[in-house]
Amino acid sequence: LAAALTEEMGWNVVVSNMAGGAGAVAFEDVLSNPDDGYRFVFYHSGAAITQIMGMYESFNVLDDFKLAGMPVLDYSNAFVSNTANEKFSDVETMVAYMKANPGDVTFATETGSFTHLHVLAFQEAAGVEFHIVDAGTASQKTTELLGKRLDVIGTQAGLVRDYLDTKEFTCLGILADERLAGRPEIPTMKEQGYDIVFSKFFYLAAPNAADDAVITAMNAGL
């Protein structure tokens, strides 16, 4: 997105990756800097879930920011395992194993995040119980899964595409109505008997005090 805005609009768009707190670090950074509208937070709709769960204490994502635009709609939310995992190989065998061994399968999420909601929904639909672990950011979860210190992570299929290509990771299911056009080999949870569908949009937002002219320009660029 930054590269496209730089090319199309002639702007110098600098990306600063701020991990932690299910987006809290990034939101707080934007709020603590000058409200001239030149600093945006790029995040997704899962922030509303985190807000409702009471994980954001120093700000409110719904009241303290204004949207500049929503450039991405994502349908690739997924459950992913390490292919070398010996407990199960797909959703069917995972559920069977979990029913025989309640709480033995670890699921990595970030407390209060969108993936936290995903795992709770799956547990209810399948009648099983994970051992839910707060393993931090998407990259941290991926590292732990690669090291076989976790059984399943909630992430986006695109974020682990390299490991899917090398067969090191297995995508157990996409939380969407239909299979992904770019990954038609991955089944949906819905077709496997679990009607769990979650999509999310990514957006750019700035503090309420930001210059409206800058917000309008960003919206036009998007």
Feature-to-residue mapping (PLM):
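Hinge/capping helix and adjacent helix->loop/strand transition within the periplasmic-binding protein
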Residues: L5, D29-Y38, I52-Q140, F201-L222
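Ligand-binding clamshell of periplasmic/extracellular solute-binding protein-like
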Residues: G21-A24, G37-T50, M70-D74, I153-Y163
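Active-site-proximal beta-strand/loop segments in catalytic clefts of secreted hydrolases
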Residues: M18-A19, Y43-H44, N82, E110, ...
